[in-house]
Amino acid sequence: MNRFNILGLGTALPPHAISQNGYATFAATVVAPEACDSNNMPGLVQVLYRRAGVQTRHSVLLASSSEDEATAERFFRRAKNIDDRGPGTAERMNRYELEAGRLAATAASKALADAAIDPEHVTHLVTVSCSGFSAPGVDLYH
């Protein structure tokens, strides 16, 4: 049986970020008011985001960084009506596929540097994303 070792780790984040509080404020504005059973939707969203344990959100969807404003976020727009659910799964996965390769390449370069080995010595690549997936995956990015 072959043994394996994790020789290097590399991570990458999108360049722009927003505070959790700032994104909670933005999230509360994109929900159609009539889609909620409560008049206190902004307050409920704030509680949900505060309890998530996240401090900062990095996103490829932000055109610039700001502590508390997501004004450059255009992918998720304010709901037009109660049936408007925003971008569908296909649209979100297309955006993921467009953005993920660059981040994966950055993380892979860092992992190779951390391992101090040449790429031709790598036999397996493990990737993790909390945002989406594509098939074939980011391992074919070039």
Positions of PLM-derived features:
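Short glycine-rich or small-residue beta-strand-to-loop segments that form or flank ligand, phosphate
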Residues: R95, T123-S129
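A glycine- and small-aliphatic-rich helix-loop capping segment at beta-alpha/alpha-beta transitions
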Residues: S134-H142
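Gly/Ser/Thr-rich loops at beta-strand to alpha-helix junctions
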Residues: A12-P14, S129-A135
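Conserved "HGTGT" condensation-loop signature of ketosynthase/thiolase-family condensing enzymes
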Residues: M1-E120
